Amino acid sequence: LPDAKILHGDHIRDDVGSTLVVGHDLWTVRNADVVIVNGEEKVGAGTAQEILMAKYFQKPVVCVMPKETHHRKSNLSFNGLLIEDWIHPFLDVSSDYIAPSLEDAVAWVKDYEAGKITTPIKGISVFEKAIEQFESRFPEMVKRYTKP
C-alpha cells in the first residue's frame, strides 16, 4: 500500500490525561480509511474499545490473527462440540475480515480500495443484531435473566 500511513498511539502518552489519550486514539480511528488490528497477541482494553468505535464510525476492521494465537485456536471443544477454527466471538463479530497474515490483510485492503469487496462493512448495529439473535434463539434464558 504505497499511500498508506500508519497511525499509532505512541505520539501521545498517558501523562497528558485519560481524556486526551482517548481523544487522540479515537481521532485516529474516526479519520482512518481502514482499521487494521494486530490480533496476534492478546488484545488490550484500549484496542477492544477502538474496534467498537470503528464500528460506530462505520470503518472497516481487518484483524490480523493467524491460527494458534491467543484469540484463534484450532479444534477447540466447547460442551462436546468441536469447533475447527475458533475465533474470539467479539473479534469475529466486529471484524470485517480476519486475516491469517499481514500480507492477507494488505491484499484485502487493496481489494476493498479497488471496490472488489462486495460484503457491506459492519456498523454498530452488528451488536444489536447479535442481541436479537440471542433473544430469538434462547428465549428461556432471556426469561431467567429478566426480572419478574
Which sequence ranges carry the predicted segments?
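Conserved catalytic or regulatory cores that recognize and/or transform ribose-phosphate-containing ligands
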Residues: L1-P148
